[in-house]
């Protein structure tokens, strides 16, 4: 079983690429980590609709932040989209955006648990994530927290992944054989 991390910027094609990686797999579950679409944000609704329209009808879908549980219980391939919204959801669920120390503890605990589950995964798992480390350093504490925590999360997942693909402007770079930073 393989774990693949697909990382890229907004609208880079990373989700399409992740979906293509498992397109020939008979049993796929799409794991959406973003906030459910309640129709209150038309732009978000359009993004969700675009993602749904692209997926094969045979795929099952689940909306959850409980990634460890899903990974440990899966017999078929998983596409997790995406780790950035997962991290945001964890901090939202903890109500900790104003308590970044507590938020950091929650994220570290969940990151460790996720990486352990991925290391022991019994099915193919493709995870989509945002590359935010190439952007400007945010001016707000919560923005810097998010950027730093997502960078740490991405590095942890990349360390246990069999494959790492960077998607930039619709092009895929395979980083799977690139050395890890010690």
Question: What annotation goes with each model-predicted range?
Answer:
Residues 35-36, 85, 133-135:
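A short, flexible beta-alpha/helix-coil linker loop
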Residues 28, 78, 164-166:
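Short, well-ordered beta-strand core segments
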Residues 2-73:
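Conserved P-loop
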Residues 54-94, 98-110, 118-119:
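Portal/gating segments that form or line small-molecule/metal binding sites
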């Amino acid at each position: 079983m393989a774990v693949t991390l697909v990382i890229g910027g907004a609208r880079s094609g990373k989700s399409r690429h992740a979906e293509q990686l498992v397109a020939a797999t008979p049993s796929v579950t799409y794991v959406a980590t973003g906030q459910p679409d309640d129709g209150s944000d038309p732009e978000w609704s359009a993004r969700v609709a675009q993602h749904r329209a692209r997926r094969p009808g045979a795929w099952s879908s689940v909306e959850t932040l409980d990634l460890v549980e899903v990974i440990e219980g899966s017999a078929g391939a998983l596409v997790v989209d995406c780790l950035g919204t997962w991290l945001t959801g964890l901090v939202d669920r903890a109500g900790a955006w104003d308590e970044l120390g507590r938020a950091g503890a929650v994220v570290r605990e969940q990151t460790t648990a996720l990486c352990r589950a991925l290391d022991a995964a019994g099915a193919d798992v493709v995870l989509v994530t945002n590359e935010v480390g190439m952007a400007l350093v945010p001016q707000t504490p919560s923005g810097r927290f998010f950027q730093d925590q997502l960078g740490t999360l991405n590095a942890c997942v990349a360390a246990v992944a069999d494959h790492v693909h960077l998607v930039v402007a619709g092009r895929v770079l395979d980083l799977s054989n690139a050395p890890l930073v010690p």
